[in-house]
């Protein structure tokens, strides 16, 4: 939720609306993605996660579901924003969302200081009972709390800076994965049935330097929106005054998602990203 500081300053009943926002987003996302879980709450942000291995019973259903995650997030984001405006009519309050992906490994022992070369991110499990916090159990009653740490986690927070209302911003790796899934699976001669091609809904709207990401090389900012041809639906009348990216979009200075192939190639990252995509598909098969 964006703009909540001003809202809290002038609205005495803000705790009710913030709590309602938490509840609405979580319950609606869980309705769309049953396996989703709360990672943590950060102020007016809700961080949630899902393992791609939990998305279905077979490769076809998991792959189809994965490709539709941006659509599902967009749906919930739009519904939450609509409810806020119906209840409060405060244009300065906006709902924004970011989706990214990372390969992680669980750290069972802190004696081994080296990570698996395929994973630069970890699941750090905190024993809540050892910390004297047994009352703060997770939603499934477990006594441990998981946190996700690593450079790919940081990328998600950096990319979130470019989130925009009525759009979903995706990390480049996640966008590339969604673009590649149909081709990769067909290459393996698997009968892949999907009636939805996400490429038309993803656009590279800008290239930005993100602190600590890609050695300060320009990073592609990807937005999801289901109807790029309808300019009247894309933005509010004054959005171009608030965000320079809007001008780029309206003037057509955007790139199709398959441009990512060239980006990774020119940065020498093709081998790395293809290995990641193959690893993700292996997880989808399990």
Give the residues covered by each predicted segment:
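Low-complexity, intrinsically disordered regions enriched in charged/polar residues
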Residues: 12, 19, 23, 104, ...
């Amino acid at each position: 939720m964006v703009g909540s500081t001003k809202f809290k300053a002038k609205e005495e009943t803000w705790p009710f609306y913030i709590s309602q926002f938490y509840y609405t987003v979580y319950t609606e996302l869980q309705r769309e993605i049953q396996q989703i879980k709360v990672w943590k709450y950060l102020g007016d942000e809700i961080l949630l996660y899902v393992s791609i291995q939990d998305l279905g019973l077979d490769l076809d259903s998991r792959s189809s579901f994965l490709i539709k995650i941006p659509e599902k997030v967009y749906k919930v984001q739009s519904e939450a924003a609509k409810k806020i405006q119906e209840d409060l009519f405060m244009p300065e309050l906006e709902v924004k969302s970011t989706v990214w992906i990372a390969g992680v490994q669980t750290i069972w022992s802190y004696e081994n200081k080296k990570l698996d070369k395929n994973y630069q991110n970890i699941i750090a499990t905190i024993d809540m009972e050892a910390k004297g916090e047994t009352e703060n159990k997770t939603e499934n009653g477990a006594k441990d709390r998981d946190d996700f740490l690593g450079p790919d986690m940081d990328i998600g927070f950096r990319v979130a800076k470019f989130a925009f209302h009525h759009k979903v911003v995706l990390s480049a790796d996640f966008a590339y994965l969604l673009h590649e899934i149909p081709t990769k699976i067909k290459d393996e001669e698997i009968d892949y049935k999907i009636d939805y091609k996400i490429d038309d809904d993803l656009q590279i709207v800008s290239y930005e330097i993100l602190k600590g990401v890609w050695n300060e090389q320009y990073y592609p900012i990807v937005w999801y929106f289901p109807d790029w041809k309808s300019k009247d639906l894309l933005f509010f009348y004054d959005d171009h005054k608030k965000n320079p990216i809007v001008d780029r979009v309206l003037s057509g200075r955007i790139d199709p998602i398959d441009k990512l192939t060239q980006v990774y190639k020119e940065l020498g990252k093709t081998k790395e990203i293809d290995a990641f995509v193959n690893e993700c598909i292996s997880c989808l098969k399990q």
